[in-house]
Structures are given as structure tokens and as C-alpha cells.
Amino acid sequence: MNFQLTREQELVRQMVREFAVNEVKPIAAEIDETERFPMENVQKMAKLGMLGIPFSKEYGGAGGDTLSYILAVEELSKVCGTTGVIVSAHTSLCASLIEQFGNPTQKGKYLKDLATGKKLGAFGLTEPGAGTDAAGQQTVAVLEDDHYVLNGSKIFITNGGVAETFIIFAMTDKSKGTKGISAFIVEKDFPGFSIGKKEEKLGIRASSTTELVMVNCIVPKENLIGQEGKGFGIAMKTLDGGRIGIAAQALGIAEGAFEEAVAYMKERKQFGRPIAAFQGLQWMIAEMDTKIEAARHLVYKAACLKEAKMPYSVDAARAKLYAAEVAMEVTTKAVQIFGGYGYTKEYPVERMMRDAKITEIYEGTSEVQKMVIAGSALR
């Protein structure tokens, strides 16, 4: 087992780290406060190839591996959880789905624009009555001649208000349950498609989280991904990969808060000495550090298994479950270390704590991850 990154992976990490520190960190507090989507940085990331790291050069990608992509999400999330999830949702949930399940025509038409960052992508599965119960889809798709007509709505869609390419799941045969769900590529300009309510959120406030509305939305027949009835399987396999991205986001948030806490402990003085000299806080730091390292190994292992085309579903669930819990614990402890200052916006740890919470919820709640893990263990 090799715990060293390759030269290429190190280069990706260093490049993204420098970008995160120089371009993302300076505006992180401002975009959180104003809920402003950081389009200028998304465009810069596109030019640097950061929106297509794991995709083949044939389709405009960087030709990197899964771990390189995960390292990028981690580094971005150290300074801004919002920026991390923008990249993760675009890459893991939309572009990767088309790469894995799309046909050559669909890849040629859509994947290149996504991999180069010319267009942003989003993933539309969650509905008002179908969150964890993804099988309870109410959006329907009816085939009429050379097109499908979609009716329904999706909620809590990351990148919803800024994406141009969407993956939408809809029922093509309600009588078949999960086997009646199909997946479609929908463009924002398709007739009958619109963006609904924009959510106001506790954390990741600068990400565009919206409702998607389809009223007699016309989708060309050729935009069906795979075959009718295969959508549920496509969604579940895609979410397996997406969970590694969110685990990387959680890992990055935890690392960012940890670094802030360590720096503060070295400079903050109480009773005539730095608070880093107090054993109680030293033990807290030791626990935070150890849990971050444990989370890192789970996340990197899941990424490596995915890259090797080995079974990774349970490993992705473990990584997301643990990294999310660690992110919540570490950010909360970081706020505690800062004391009253940690509760103010003068320091970034309160934002990091707010950003961390969502990692326990989206792309499968922690409870769902436990079901996946337990199901495997008890099989």
C-alpha cells in the first residue's frame, strides 16, 4: 500500500492550493455574507482546467485521476466550502454521469462543454416529497413522437440557478416503481423549463441552491440517458461517486478549521502565556488532528478504489459518514477554542461550522450512509 501521492497529484494539489489561497480565500467571507455566486472564480477555475480534472483529454478534460480531483475539492474547501461543492456537484453529479452513462453523441455534445467549464452542470433528483426516498419521484416524462414531455419539480439543486446543463430524473412508467425512473439531459433553454425559488441557507450560502420547474418541458428523445427505466440505477451509482466528493469537501472544511485553530492558539495569550501551552486545549487539538487523518485515509481510499474500478460503494459511504462527522466536530471545537471571537464573523471558523453541517445531509444523510454500511456488514 503506497501512501505517497504521485508527482502529478502533488502538482494538482499545489496548483489548487495556490489558487484557493490567492483567489478564493480573499472573497470567501464576502460571498457568504452576500450570498453572491462566485462566477469570476468559477471562470478562472475553468481556464485552469479545474472543472475537468478527471475527464479524458478527448472530451476537453485534464486526463487526471479520481484522487487528483478529490484533492482539488479538498483544497478549495479548506478556505471555502461553497467553492468546493460548486466543483463537486458539477463534476461528480453531472459531468461524470454523462461520461459514464452517456452515449458518444451525448458526450460529444455535452461533456466537452462541461469538462472545459464552458458550461456548469447540475443534478436534479430531490423533490419536495422525495428526498431520502429517491424512489418516490413525482416528476413524469411522457414520450410523444420525437420528444419527451416532462412535468414536475425538483428542490435543493446545487448550481441550480447558474447551470446550463441538467440531469433530470423522471418517471416514465409509474407502475414499475424504481424500474420506471429514467434519466434525461435537459438544457436550461428547453421550452417549459424554468428556475424556481432560490433557497436561503445556513451554510454554503454563496452556492446557488434552487428549485427547478418543468411545465410541459420538451426534451428531445435523444437526450434520454441509457434506456427507459435505468434512471434509478444511474442515480445511485452516480451518488456513490458524489459522496466521495462531499467527503473531500468535509475533509477540507475540517482541515481549514483545524489550521485556523492551531494558528490562533499560538498567538492568543491568557494568564501570561499562549493558550497552546494549556494541556486541555492540546488534547483537543490532538483529537482533532487524529480524526482528520483518519478521515483523510477513508476519503483517499474510496477515491483510489473508484479509480481502480473496484467496488467502492460502501467505502464511499464510510468516507462520507466519517468525514462529515469529523467536519462538524472539528469546526465546533475550533469555535470553542476561539471563544467569543469564534462566534463572531471576525474569524472564519463560524462560517466553517455552518458550512460543515450540510455535509451530514446532502447526497445521502449520515443515516443513509449507516444503512448502506450496515447492510453490507450484515449481508
Task: Enumerate the language-model features and the residues they cover.
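Flexible, small-/acidic-enriched active-site or ligand-binding loops
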Residues: 136, 189-220
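A short, Trp-centered hydrophobic/proline-enriched beta-strand micro-motif
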Residues: 117-125
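Short glycine/proline-enriched turns and hinge-like loops at secondary-structure junctions
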Residues: 64-65, 133-135, 159-164, 177-180, ...
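Alpha-helical interface subdomain recognition
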Residues: 1-89, 101-106, 113-118, 131-134, ...
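Short Gly/Pro-enriched turn/cap motifs at secondary-structure boundaries
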Residues: 87, 114, 129-132, 156-159, ...
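Flexible, glycine-rich active-site loops centered on histidine and acidic residues
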Residues: 95-101, 123, 135
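Short Ser/Thr-interspersed hydrophobic loop/turn segments at strand-loop and sheet-helix junctions
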Residues: 49, 73-77, 170, 186-191, ...
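A short core secondary-structure module
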Residues: 146-147, 151-195
